[in-house]
Structure formats: structure tokens, C-alpha cells
């Protein structure tokens, strides 16, 4: 069956018939192997959104595509914080296209912060593993099978995407953004010694119970939140694996990084240095 629609100017199909026909021969064998590897695991993807009307249809389509091709059980939880651009209305259309068993809408009335968005999402997650990632297409779902493979190789508590190892990298940033990111990562490595190469990235896979404990312990907001998550994971002796990823600057909308966020980052870094 093909479920399709036209959302936010993008034509979508949840499972194209051509893709299912390709699941023969080597494709079918590969999918069977991945299903066996997945066991009884289920993956909940948390997508906090704010003004992501144009990006949401494509990121959801890509997530559905790569999860369906891999054969892993999954759900996508959209946590919209009262976006004025109609993001929630688009999410409702996506729920109709793909089904309420795959697309779960858990909106909030206003913008309350990333940490509380994760707490809210975890409360509704039915998977034993949780992906966190940006909804603005900066994180490509094609890396999801790599995360799952890495986690199973070492039974890691956390698998973090890294832009600074192997084939990882950043595309679409100007020199200023690259210098800020590299500089922030360099300083945090010196001060905090976290045991991970990319502290400020936000594409990660957690065991659900691990994510719950980390979110409860973290007090930071904004861009420091992701950094504190890794630092606290190290403090609690959680194992951390890494997967090289390519980060691509958002396709639609404006970056939420500004001067206030940079100042907050520096304050948060000093706080973590003093308390860890």
C-alpha cells in the first residue's frame, strides 16, 4: 500500500511501491539480517520543533524511508513549542499520511526549552532506545543505521554523532560559524576532558533509561545543554561511542545561534568546569 500526500509544498509517499519491489534478492536478505540484529528493540525519535514548517515534511519522509528500509521498529515524536508558522498543522497532516502509530504529536503551548522538550518526549516514548536530532535537516537520517550498528557493537549507553573524526564534517557554514564551533569544541576539550570528540553536536542515540537519568541531572539551557549531557554521562560512567556524521546547515529558516547563545555557552562552560 502506498500512503501519500502533499505537505508544505512537498509531495510525500510513506512507502513507495518501487522501494518495496527492490526488497528482493540481496535487498531482502539484508533487511532480514537487520531485523534479526534489531531483535525486539524499538527506536523513538524525538523531534523538538519551533518554526520548522518547511523542514518537517522532508525530515519525516527521510526518517520513515531509512527506518523502513532498515527494518527497525520506530516511532517519531514531534514536540512543537507553539510555533507561530503553522508547524503543528503540518505535523497533523504528516500524522494522517503515515499513521498515528508512527507519528506522535505531543505539542506544548509555548517555547519551554530543549531539556524540558526531551523530558516531555521521553514520557511518551515507547521505545527502549531514543534518538535525538535536529528537525531542520542539519542531521541526515541516512546515518541512523550507523548509530544502531555502533551501539550494538559495544552495547554503548550513548552513541554520539561527531563532526570532528573520520569522515565527519560540516557543510554550509561560513568562516565565522566554523571558527565558533571549532573554538568552542577545543576549549571544552581542554577544560572538561569529556572523552568525546564533539560536545556540542545534537545527533545522538541513547538507551532510554540513560537519557532519562541524564536529563534529570542536567541544569543547562540552550546550546550548553548538549555539552552537559556528555559531561554528565562521563561522570556517571556511561559508555560513549561515536559515529562520524556530516552536518549540513539548515535548508529552510534561520539559524537560532546568536550573540546571546554564545554568551550563555561561555557561562555554561565555566559552570561545568567549576562543578565537574
List where the protein language model places each region.
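Conserved donor nucleotide-binding strand/loop of the catalytic core
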Residues: 74-77, 88-124
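Short, well-formed alpha-helical segments that are part of the catalytic scaffolds
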Residues: 52-68
